[in-house]
């Protein structure tokens, strides 16, 4: 069997100190097969977004093993984690996190340039055209609709050609129709590249469209079903 894209083993994570210490993730163990899509749902405060931050190398765990793309994130220093994020993980958030003074093209190209890609602007142009924004390359975020800004964010996430795409409520700030377009783009990109998609959402129907649905509650997985059972 091929190595999983993601594997967590007995992961614990707490935030705060002393009496204010809160257990966010509790003894989590699961794996995600490469090239599949997983929708994670659960009430607010269940640990969904924190789990994504762990998978993206943006949050440290207290104990346990975190393996993503064959690399042990829990053993990496900050510089190694930054390099890992730059080459292996694409991240899309609910809020678009675009630089307001940069054009759409620059928002996608500059992170690539900083990671040493010489073809940064050409790659950025290709990705923006793939998400339907070839005609908006020189527009700034303020000149773009919410849906267009999220398309820029998706292009930016996909430009380094990551093996794993992580999305935290990517349609949360969008109307229903625009949200559907954004999700279709992400699923198409996943299939086209053979990437693994891990998606946190409040939308049960969206989670059910994934190959697998995981339900979290109070930092634990309480349900884990394949697509056939999720429908």
Predicted regions and their residues:
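ABC-family P-loop ATPase nucleotide-binding domain
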Residues: 1-14, 223-231
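Residue-level detector of flexible, active-site-proximal loop/helix-junction positions
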Residues: 80, 220, 228
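H-loop (His-switch) and adjacent beta-strand-loop-beta switch element
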Residues: 213-225
């Amino acid at each position: 069997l091929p190595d999983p894209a993601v594997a967590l083993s007995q992961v614990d994570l707490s935030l705060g100190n002393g009496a204010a210490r809160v257990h966010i993730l509790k003894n989590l163990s699961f794996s995600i097969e490469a090239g599949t899509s997983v929708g994670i749902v659960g009430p607010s405060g269940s640990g969904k977004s924190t789990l994504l931050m762990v998978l993206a190398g943006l949050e440290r765990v207290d104990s346990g093993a975190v393996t993503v793309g064959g690399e042990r994130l829990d053993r990496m220093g900050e510089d190694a984690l930054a390099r890992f994020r730059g080459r292996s993980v694409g991240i899309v958030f609910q809020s678009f996190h675009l630089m307001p003074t940069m054009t759409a093209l620059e928002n996608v190209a500059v992170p690539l340039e900083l990671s040493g890609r010489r073809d940064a602007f050409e790659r950025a142009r290709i990705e923006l055209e793939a998400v339907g924004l070839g005609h908006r390359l020189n527009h700034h975020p303020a000149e773009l609709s919410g849906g267009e800004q999220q398309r820029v964010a998706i292009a930016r996430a996909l430009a380094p050609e990551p093996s794993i795409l992580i999305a935290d409520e990517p349609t949360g700030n969008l109307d229903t129709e625009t949200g559907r377009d954004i999700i279709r783009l992400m699923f198409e990109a996943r299939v086209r590249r053979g990437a693994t998609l891990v998606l946190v959402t409040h939308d049960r129907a969206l989670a059910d469209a994934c190959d697998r649905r995981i339900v979290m509650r109070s930092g634990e997985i309480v349900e884990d079903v394949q697509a056939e059972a999720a429908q």
